[in-house]
UniProtKB/Swiss-Prot annotation:
GO biological process: gluconeogenesis
Family the entry assigns: Belongs to the PEP-utilizing enzyme family.
Protein name per the record: Phosphoenolpyruvate synthase
Organism for this UniProt entry: Pyrococcus furiosus (strain ATCC 43587 / DSM 3638 / JCM 8422 / Vc1)
Assembly, per entry: Homooctamer.
Entry GO MF terms: ATP binding; metal ion binding; pyruvate, water dikinase activity
Reaction(s) this enzyme catalyzes, per UniProt: pyruvate + ATP + H2O = phosphoenolpyruvate + AMP + phosphate + 2 H(+)
PROSITE patterns with a match to the protein in the record: PEP_ENZYMES_2, PEP_ENZYMES_PHOS_SITE
Group of enzyme by EC: transferase
NCBIfam families named in the record: PEP_synth, PRK06464.1
Known pathway: Carbohydrate biosynthesis; gluconeogenesis
Length: 817
């Protein structure tokens, strides 16, 4: 075949993704649309393919390049089995990958590093090198220079592999100077196709490693005086009539990576009125390395530009409007709102567009008629939006679980507050509305997991709404409309036809901090697993046990223990199988007495003034060991089927003796802690946080913060009482100090730390937890992707801050709290 190694932007369009990847194709498309894109060319995917298929590598080459690495592990095995004659680099790569267990992180790191080293160390074929040199020479001549500064970026090309899957995985090199340096950076881009996390992702998604290629974009470097990103639809409010611009000093990497908090400007389309300006404190900026003339460094704004520049508005009002209008032009070309990277070049003062991609998080825009209908619809009730989405139908008001049969498929369930006994009715409902509760209440948690719209804390739903009425529930905004609002229902149906509220992870980022998911019911295991979560940080026992329709102790006393064990085992296995080999942490029963009392056979349950502080969790489990024993028997059944990914998590622990006694009961039924299952505890009681070292010495593998309880116990706030809900704050300094202390001690002893409370689904809390060094965060199914993005961003910030600290030799930073 005739290979095409180089393609100029002018020769490309959006249809050339297979040849130059999404990034390269997009730059070509914009160039030909008259957008001011810095000129450049792409080293095509065919060049990479030619490189790996035509560069012959001998055993001696491998030994010379990899040195001591060839004497151990996979590389040694591959060498021993390889033929003596030189063979294509691709054969070596595929042999190494075929023998790599991607779940063995040490092996994965070592083997992918070996592949990258081979790619970077081998000479570029002369036929490719000469074309790159000639193209670079032509690019330099366009600017009347012998050598021009360029940026070299990777661009993924597999048509069935979204480029988003490579986000943060392949390399970008800025301020590259000279043809030889360009060739080196192209090879480094190619090598980044084989990072551990990119390889892991492809393996887990079932992609064929041999059919994934990489193009490298070589583009004239904008020597940015000011730069940033813009969204041609407001990503916060979903308002398509607004453009949001973020701006900071220097090169755009500081903004894109999250290393700096940029200025934020909101511009109204059409009128070009600047509606809002938030001037940030911009501490750092990225510039061309002044010492080497190559690459970039991060410097302090106060030292490089002057103290007054830290809080100075980056863009003039005229520039804000110029950037906004350019964004509108790009959106008009593509016909969809765009996420755009822009920069002002300090050499010529002109605005340039570096990259543009569609915003994928927007919902379809309502028509003017639909918007008017929503505006005119009568809001009859307001509360807290607890689970997003739209639900419309006939109201059914119930007050206890004995009435759940009244709720039919598609009804709107209205009640004071839901409980586990109502779950069968909740599954049938089109939406749920409650008088009481907050975003951490039972109704909120279960609705989010089921994907059912829910509004909580309305105070008067059961009074204002009558059985037989028709209403439309907006679980996103916390509103209940009178009657059926057709435009909202239409949007819901369109979303459903397109797959509904998508939680499936098309291309999850790989983060150092694991992002897990909370699961209440085995029925949603597949949906939860599809989020791409790294495991289950909380599998609740309550719904499985209470769904038997009878008080579990009465069930056991009637000689039905084996039936209970089977039902539990069936549910646990369903989740363990959906996530295997990812870990699944099962929390033993933690239902308060009021939930037991409402069940058939629960008439002997004690009346407690505050059940949340009463007979529940492990304290009840040890008082009624027959129930805990049944749970352990169920887990043993699942383990015996080969599921070695289960952990046991004890709730409401406050003393080491509770751990010791629970282990004794587990061993009685043949379940061996630390061997058959991982063993851990919930940190929900301040006492557990304070004596964490004693709990660790009793023998635990992991802990998980139950912040819903930890917060209410620390602050003396009933989380389901809407009168004090405004005081409920998981980020209260006292709560955070307890969490920080536990993480610090657990790190010292090698005990894994996680969180499974509602706070794990809060981006603000996730950022704090990453900085505190937590090992994993377990979120609700609908929040997994958001939390993973937040975690990835915060981890990048930490790495950049560490680099800056080393660069500036700063004093040790203040503690977060």
């Amino acid at each position: 075949m005739a290979y095409r190694f180089i393609k100029w932007f002018e020769e490309l369009s959006k249809n050339d993704v297979p040849l130059v990847g999404g990034k390269g194709a997009n730059l070509g498309e914009m160039t030909n649309a008259g957008i001011p894109v810095p000129p450049g060319f792409c080293v095509t995917a065919e060049a990479y393919k030619y490189f790996v298929e035509n560069v012959k590598v001998s055993k001696e080459d491998v030994k010379r390049i990899l040195g001591e690495k060839v004497n151990k592990g996979t590389i040694s095995e591959v060498l021993a089995q390889a033929p003596d004659e030189p063979r294509p680099l691709q054969d070596w790569i595929m042999d190494i990958i075929s023998k790599t267990d991607v779940d063995d992180s040490k092996m994965l790191q070592e083997n992918t590093e070996a592949i990258r080293t081979l790619i970077k160390s081998l000479d570029m074929p002369s036929e490719i090198a000469e074309e790159i040199k000639q193209a670079y020479k032509e690019l330099s001549q366009r600017f009347g220079q012998e050598e021009v500064y360029v940026a070299v970026r990777s661009s993924a090309t597999a048509e069935d592999l979204p480029e988003a899957s490579f986000a943060g995985q392949q390399e970008t090199y800025l301020d590259v100077l000279g043809a030889d340096d360009v060739i080196d950076k192209v090879k480094r881009c190619w090598a980044s196709l084989w990072t551990a996390r990119a390889t892991f992702y492809r393996a887990k998604q079932g992609f064929d490693h041999s059919k994934v290629y990489l193009s490298a974009v070589v583009q004239k470097m904008v020597n940015s005086e000011k730069s940033g990103v813009m969204f041609t639809a407001n990503p916060v409010t979903n308002n398509r009539n607004e453009i949001m611009i973020n701006a900071s000093w220097g090169l755009g990497e500081a903004v894109v990576s999250g290393a700096v908090t940029p200025d934020e400007y909101i511009v109204e389309k059409g009128t070009w009125k600047i509606k809002e300006k938030v001037i940030a404190k911009k501490e750092v900026m990225v510039i061309r390395n002044p010492e080497t003339g190559r690459g970039t460094v991060m410097v302090k704004v106060a030292e490089y530009l002057g103290p007054e520049w830290v809080e100075k508005q980056v863009l003039t009002d005229e520039q804000i409007i110029e950037v906004a209008k350019m964004g509108q032009k790009i959106e008009d070309h593509y016909g969809w709102p765009q996420d755009i990277e822009w920069a002002y070049d300090k050499d010529d003062g002109k605005l340039y567009i570096v990259q543009s991609r569609p915003i994928t998080t927007l919902k379809e825009e309502a028509t003017a008629e639909e918007a008017e209908e929503v505006e005119e619809a009568e809001v009859i009730l307001k509360g807290l939006g607890a689970s997003p989405g739209i639900g419309a139908g006939r109201v059914v008001v119930i007050f206890d679980a004995s009435e759940i049969d009244k709720v039919k498929e598609g009804d709107i369930l209205v009640t004071t507050m839901t409980n586990p006994d109502m779950v069968p009715a909740m599954k049938r409902a089109a939406a749920i509305v409650t008088d009481e509760g907050g975003r951490t209440s039972h109704a909120a948690i279960v609705s989010r997991e089921l994907g059912i719209p829910c509004v909580v804390g309305t105070k008067e739903a059961t009074k204002k709404l009558k059985t037989g009425m028709y209403v439309t529930v907006d679980g996103t905004r916390g509103l209940v409309y009178k009657g059926i609002v057709k435009s909202l229902v239409k949007k819901k149906e369109e979303a459903k036809a397109e797959g509904g509220q998508v939680v499936v992870a098309g291309a999850p980022l790989v983060t150092g901090t694991m992002v897990k998911v909370n699961v209440s019911m085995p029925e949603v295991a597949e949906r939860a697993a599809a989020t791409g979560a790294d495991g289950v940080g909380l599998l609740r026992a309550e719904h499985m046990i209470l769904s038997i329709g009878q008080h579990p102790i009465k069930f056991i006393k009637e000689g039905k223990e084996e039936e209970l064990v089977e039902k539990l085992a069936e549910g646990i296995e369903k989740v363990a199988a959906a996530f295997y080999p990812r870990p699944v942490w099962y929390r033993t029963l933690d239902a308060p007495t009021n939930e037991f009392r409402e069940m058939p056979g629960g008439e002997d349950e004690p009346e407690e003034r505050n059940p949340m502080l009463g007979w529940r969790g492990i304290r009840r489990g040890l008082d009624q060991p027959e129930l805990l024993r049944a749970e352990f028997k169920a887990i043993k059944k699942v383990v015996e089927k080969g599921y070695n990914n289960i952990g046991v998590m004890l709730p409401l622990v406050s003393h080491p003796e509770q751990i010791r006694e629970a282990k004794r009961i587990a061993r009685e039924v043949g379940l061996e802690p630390h061997k058959d299952v991982a063993w851990g505890v919930m940190i929900e009681v301040p006492a557990a946080a304070i004596i964490i070292e004693d709990l660790i010495k009793e023998g635990i593998d992991f802990v998980s913060f139950g912040t819903n309880d930890l917060t209410q116990y620390t602050l003396a706030i009933d989380r389901d009482n809407e009168r004090v809900a405004k005081l409920y704050d998981e980020t209260h300094p006292a709560v955070l100090k307890l969490i920080k202390h536990v993480i610090k001690v657990c790190k010292r002893y090698g005990v894994e730390t996680s969180i499974c409370g509602q706070a794990g689904s809060d981006p603000k809390m996730a950022r704090i937890l990453v900085r505190l060094g937590i090992d994993s965060i377990s979120a609700n199914p609908d929040a997994v992707q958001l939390i993973r993005q937040v975690v990835a961003q915060e981890e990048r910030k930490l790495m950049l801050e560490a680099a800056r600290k080393q660069l500036f030799e700063e004093e040790e930073e203040e503690e977060l709290f």
